């Protein structure tokens, strides 16, 4: 198996958040499933490198890219990533490790309760005394009289 991307301490935080494995069939149970830690290693490797799921190297021992993708999908549906995000933020806050001085707040993430100051009616733009070069008719070229 590939070197784990996450250390044991972080894994002990993540493991309880993962949903229990699906029960295996008694008759024809198929292959043994890939461990959650191996699948997480594959998921993080693909997301970090930008590799396509199908190009995940088999030598990593993370299962196929499809297996990792399915695990990612299932964990997303189970709310694992949201809970992990909340847990890590709480731990960082408790350790006073969050620096909000570099945070950027987007206007779409904070509701503007009131509108800006109301202005009067915008005055009409005065007509430009110089004719426009883009909308003036093309001058006709006069030919010299034929001799």
Swiss-Prot record:
Coiled coil: none annotated. Residues 106-147 are annotated as: Disordered. Pfam families: DUF4096. The keyword Iron does not apply. Residues 129-147 have a biased composition (Low complexity). InterPro entries: IS402-like_dom, Transposase_6_like. Keywords: Transposable element. It comes from the Bacteria. PANTHER family: BLL5188 PROTEIN, TIS1421-TRANSPOSASE PROTEIN A. Belongs to the transposase 6 family. This is Insertion element IS402 uncharacterized 16.2 kDa protein. It comes from Burkholderia cepacia.
């Amino acid at each position: 198996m590939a070197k784990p991307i996450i250390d044991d301490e972080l894994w002990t935080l993540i493991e309880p958040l993962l949903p229990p494995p699906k029960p295996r069939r008694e008759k024809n149970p198929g292959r043994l499933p890939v461990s959650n830690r191996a699948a997480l290693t594959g998921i993080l490797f693909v997301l970090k490198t930008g590799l396509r799921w199908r190009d995940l190297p088999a030598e990593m021992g993370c299962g196929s890219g499809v297996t990792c993708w399915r695990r990612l999908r299932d964990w997303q549906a189970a709310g694992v990533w949201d809970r992990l995000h909340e847990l890590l933020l709480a731990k960082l806050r408790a350790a006073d490790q969050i620096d909000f001085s570099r945070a950027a707040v987007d206007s779409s993430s904070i509701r503007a309760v009131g509108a800006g100051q109301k202005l009067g009616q915008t005055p009409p733009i005065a007509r430009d005394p110089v004719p426009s070069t883009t909308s003036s008719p093309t001058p006709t070229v006069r030919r010299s009289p034929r001799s």
